[in-house]
A protein has these predicted regions:
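Hydrophobic anchor at the beta1->P-loop junction of P-loop NTPases
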Residues: 38
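Conserved substrate/cofactor phosphate-moiety recognition/catalytic segment
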Residues: 55-105, 148
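Post-Walker A alpha-helix
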Residues: 49-50, 54
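Conserved lysine of the Walker
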Residues: 46
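Extreme N-terminal, non-catalytic leader segments
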Residues: 1-34, 68, 74-76
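P-loop (Walker A) phosphate-binding loop of NTP-binding proteins
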Residues: 41
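Glycine-rich phosphate-binding loop used to anchor ATP phosphates in small-molecule kinases
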Residues: 97-178
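A glycine- and Lys/Arg-enriched "phosphate-lid" helix/loop adjacent to the NTP-binding pocket
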Residues: 143-220
């Protein structure tokens, strides 16, 4: 069972080959490799925390959140996807018309994250003994925090939520992603809202504090409730 640990609020500011099932998609099969997911609210300081970790040791490798895919921006080393060729900033579309785009965004966010987290590790990482790979969020928070919050707030219908849960469970059973631990960057909703305004990401300028409060409650329930189990 993966370990969970919470980090208190600090001063943080703001063509690769896919591994085939035959190679066991769970890359923790690499000897000595540890896989840790860093979780937290929007603007909790995850990117800064991960950058500091990466700079602190050559044994640390970071898989960042694929947000550029959601913004329709071609990031270095990635090919342009069919959705990008069609145009559209899906992150912005979700924030502007959440009920219309909730299912589309939550589906694509999870699938793009899954793709990023299943890429074959660089040789220098895979060959290094006792290395650790840190992930900016996981497919578990995609479901248990963001998608579930959309359902609870009425942005996802019962039918959409049931379909989401069905394919999400199937993918995790078919493409196992084991995590050895979860690090939770616990930050107050007010602080994350202030940081979000400060960093000035255009899509986030109208995000309400109440939305961050709801996400905070979901993180607390998932990561700090000892009775809760990942499904």
């Amino acid at each position: 069972m993966a370990k969970r640990c919470a980090a208190g609020e600090g001063e943080l500011q703001g063509n690769e080959e896919m591994i085939s099932p035959a190679k066991k998609l769970c890359t923790s099969a690499v000897s000595g490799l540890r896989r840790i997911a860093v979780e937290g609210n929007i603007a909790a300081g995850k990117s800064t925390f991960l950058r500091l970790l990466k700079e602190s040791s050559p044994a640390y490798h970071v898989i960042s959140e694929p947000i550029t895919k959601w913004q329709n921006v071609d990031s270095p080393g990635d090919s342009v996807t069919a959705s990008q060729q069609c145009g559209g900033n899906l992150l912005d579309m979700f924030y502007r018309e959440p009920k219309r785009w909730a299912y589309t965004f939550q589906t694509y966010a999870c699938l793009s994250r899954l793709k990023a987290q299943l890429r074959q590790l660089p040789q220098e990482v895979a060959s290094q003994p006792n290395s650790t790979i840190f992930f900016e969020r996981s497919v578990h928070s995609d479901k248990l925090v963001f998608a579930e919050n959309c359902h609870d707030s009425g942005l996802l219908s019962d039918v959409e939520w049931n379909i989401y849960c069905d394919w999400h469970s199937f993918l995790l059973e078919s493409l196992p992603l084991h995590f050895d631990a979860f690090i939770y960057l616990k930050t107050t909703p007010q602080t994350t809202w202030e940081r979000m305004q400060k960093r000035g990401r255009p899509e986030e300028q109208d995000v309400a504090l109440d939305y961050l409060k709801s996400l905070h409650e979901k993180h607390e329930k998932w990561l700090l409730d000892s009775e809760n189990k990942m499904k």
